[in-house]
């Protein structure tokens, strides 16, 4: 039987306060999302009462929200939330445990983090009228201490997120390689790592590769220079194996990935390793890859008739409403450790030359609804939304259905960033669809 699987999705939910009592756009947005039997998004905060120990690192800002914020998030109709992102471990193991506990209380499916790598990488299973759907969640942007570890016969695993590691390589001319070698010699920038390599604590360099300050450089054979990246084979294999295993019992597998990495110097292009990883997931049997991370839309690719959303941008973006920040944050910005969080956030804004809150694309996104039959996408439409950039502060940073003028701008932008994938988009009758 050829069953149709219906999926709707949103981008990153960075919610820090309750939804406004008079906020009405939750209704049309919920109505659109409820078309899907799988309704998914990335929860980009921990959920706690605010008493968990802060990690010594964060995903940029230490994030935790009250359980009431989770309740408001679910008003949109989501039945799956990914928790693998750069904020997963902002409040250490206790913060992760609290988040999972609150999701279980609300009976929300989740994936992407857990007590060990097995739990973090296993899919959530959602029951639909078309059968069971598996959702895997993974993240490429994290501090190394945040990734989950495997348990062994001798030791327990480590709580954390499902990691997608990657490697970078820079190709330069022989002349530039000589320049770097001279700089390394006079500065000693490679000294400690060279010593550790001699002692066996770091793997030997491959032939033809040199290191400078922890970055790998390869001498170009044809004079071209540039950067490349590739996904970690171990993490790819773990994910591919999970997809194939899930396909044995589920009607479809969806992969959610959170990635802040960029190709060059802007947030519009997916990094090389992310494209390679997404293709590997589809090749292994996944029906779609849904990305988030960089706070603005990236291109959409149809790979073997399966959609890859490289980044859906923001759904709720309330970073400036953080109410708790540890001493580490205040010290970073030269403030007294007892300073209020609002003042700490304002200090960061003061010293930025290109604030996220001044970029229109950060406030624009799309919500995809798509249908899958026999592993392929048979229908795809996008609801254009905007996050109230020009509204009063109390009404900003939450989603509204975009007006026609804004929707057309979103369609034009999406066409531009999707051009490398051969997809063009147009606004038609309240939706953004593939250009005929």
What residues fall within each predicted segment?
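Acidic, metal/ion-coordinating pockets
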Residues: 1-436
């Amino acid at each position: 039987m050829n069953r149709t699987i219906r999926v709707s999705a949103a981008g990153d939910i960075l919610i820090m306060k309750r939804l406004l009592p008079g906020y009405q756009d939750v209704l049309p947005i919920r109505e659109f999302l409820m078309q899907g039997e799988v309704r998914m998004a990335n929860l980009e905060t921990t959920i706690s009462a605010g008493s968990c120990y802060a990690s010594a690192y964060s995903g940029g800002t230490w994030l935790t929200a009250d359980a009431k914020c989770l309740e408001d998030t679910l008003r949109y109709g989501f039945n799956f939330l990914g928790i693998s992102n750069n904020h997963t471990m902002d409040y250490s193991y206790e913060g992760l445990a609290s988040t999972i506990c609150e999701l279980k209380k609300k009976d929300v499916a989740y994936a992407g983090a857990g007590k060990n790598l097995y739990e973090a990488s296993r899919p959530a299973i959602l029951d639909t009228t078309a059968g069971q759907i598996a959702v895997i969640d993974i993240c490429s942007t994290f501090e190394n201490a945040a990734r989950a570890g495997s348990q062994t016969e001798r030791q327990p695993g480590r709580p954390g997120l499902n990691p997608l590691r990657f490697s970078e390589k820079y190709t330069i001319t022989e002349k530039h390689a000589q320049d770097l070698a001279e700089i390394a010699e006079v500065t000693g920038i490679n000294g400690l790592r060279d010593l550790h390599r001699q002692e066996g604590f770091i793997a030997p360099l491959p032939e033809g590769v040199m290191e400078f300050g922890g970055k790998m450089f390869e001498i170009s054979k044809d004079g071209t220079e540039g950067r490349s990246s590739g996904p970690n084979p171990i993490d790819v294999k773990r994910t591919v194996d999970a997809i194939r295993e899930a396909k044995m019992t589920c009607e479809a597998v969806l992969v959610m990935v959170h990635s802040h990495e960029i190709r060059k110097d802007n947030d519009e292009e997916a990094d090389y390793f992310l494209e390679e990883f997404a293709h590997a997931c589809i090749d292994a049997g996944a029906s779609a890859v849904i990305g988030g991370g960089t706070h603005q839309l990236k291109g959409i690719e149809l790979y073997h008739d399966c959609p890859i959303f490289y980044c859906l941008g923001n759904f709720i973006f309330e970073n400036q409403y953080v109410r708790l920040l540890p001493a580490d944050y205040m010290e970073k910005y030269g403030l007294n450790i007892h300073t209020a969080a609002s003042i700490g956030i304002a200090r960061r804004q003061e010293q930025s030359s290109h604030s996220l809150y001044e970029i229109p694309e950060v406030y624009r996104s799309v919500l995809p609804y798509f249908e899958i039959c026999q592993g392929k996408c048979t229908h795809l439409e996008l609801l254009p939304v905007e996050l109230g950039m020009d509204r009063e502060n109390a009404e900003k940073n939450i989603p509204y259905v975009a007006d026609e003028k804004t929707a057309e701008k979103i369609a034009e932008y999406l066409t531009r960033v999707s051009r490398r994938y051969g997809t063009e988009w147009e606004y038609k009758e309240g939706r953004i669809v593939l250009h005929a």
